[in-house]
Amino acid sequence: FPTRRSSDLDKIGCQLAIIHKRRDPNKANETTTHEVVGEVEGKTCLLVDDMVDTAGTMCQAALALKKHGAKRVIAAATHPILSDPAAERINNSPIEELIVTNTLKIRDDIDIPAMTLLSIAPLIAKAIQEVFEDGSVTSLFR
């Protein structure tokens, strides 16, 4: 785990727990086991992933956290692919809020009441500004 991320967690007073997933080599895109490494009992847990497609992994991870005593589970993903049956899975999971960005258009038939959509427009605008002013785009992600 990168030192910078550990330092970021220390700054905001958070602890790290890791969910180890195992893939079944005989089944494509399917995880089978989720092990929670770290103390989550009585805590609000934030699941972070790069994307949420069918939401199988995310929802299984949320169930594992609740099984280990998590008080609340919030999930965040940069790219909301949301292929079927993602909406159904999320709506029937212990995930209280799903936070995603607008890097992809969300289909009109997707109904996830607990979903919060954040715009990446300010980040893109700042990146363009940095490029035109000979600044650093990398600095936006530090």
Stretches with model-predicted labels:
Residues 10-112:
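PRPP/pyrophosphate-binding module of the type I phosphoribosyltransferase fold
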Residues 109-142:
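Peripheral docking tails and interdomain loops at the edges
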